[in-house]
């Protein structure tokens, strides 16, 4: 599995791309290369792989994703009384929020079955709490949803 930094790739940060391009003309190409390294290693060793990134320019710099998901689609893998262990004041119980995320995968990676939970219509209201540049905010925005992580583990583990 690979989780390349989305800072230079995610379209949610497009307002900052021009400023970043002035500092480093190749910043997005270099960011996309980190994904390609993970892909090349998986290909070299013939192992299943999964690369996760939000909706981003990676789709045009490399290739289209193999799948997409929203966290709430896998919230059913978490207990009914679930609260996030570190950020329960921000992340909804059972990952009950939308955030389209892209997955590039191959070499036998098994896509997990969805187990959706109810979610409010529209945009995630936790986005209101996740603006800014603090380290905590950046960490929270970059976390892989726990329900999806568990679903991937169960789908791809031969020991379960």
Enumerate the language-model features and the residues they cover.
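N-terminal Rossmann-like NAD(P) cofactor-binding module of classical short-chain dehydrogenase/reductase
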Residues: 1
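Class I S-adenosyl-L-methionine
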Residues: 6-160
């Amino acid at each position: 599995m690979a989780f390349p930094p989305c800072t230079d790739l995610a379209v949610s940060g497009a307002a900052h791309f021009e400023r970043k391009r002035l500092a480093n003309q190749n910043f997005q190409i270099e960011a996309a290369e980190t994904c390609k390294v993970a892909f090349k290693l998986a290909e070299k060793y013939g192992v299943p792989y999964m690369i996760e990134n939000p909706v981003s320019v990676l789709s045009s710099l490399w290739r289209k994703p193999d799948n997409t998901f929203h966290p709430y689609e896998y919230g059913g893998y978490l207990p009914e009384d679930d609260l996030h262990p570190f950020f329960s004041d921000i992340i909804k119980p059972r990952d009950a929020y939308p955030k389209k995320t892209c997955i590039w995968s191959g070499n036998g990676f098994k896509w997990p079955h969805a187990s959706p939970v109810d979610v409010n219509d529209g945009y995630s209201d936790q986005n209101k709490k996740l603006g800014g540049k603090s380290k905590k905010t950046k960490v929270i925005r970059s976390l892989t949803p726990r329900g999806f992580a568990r679903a991937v583990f169960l789908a791809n583990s031969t020991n379960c």
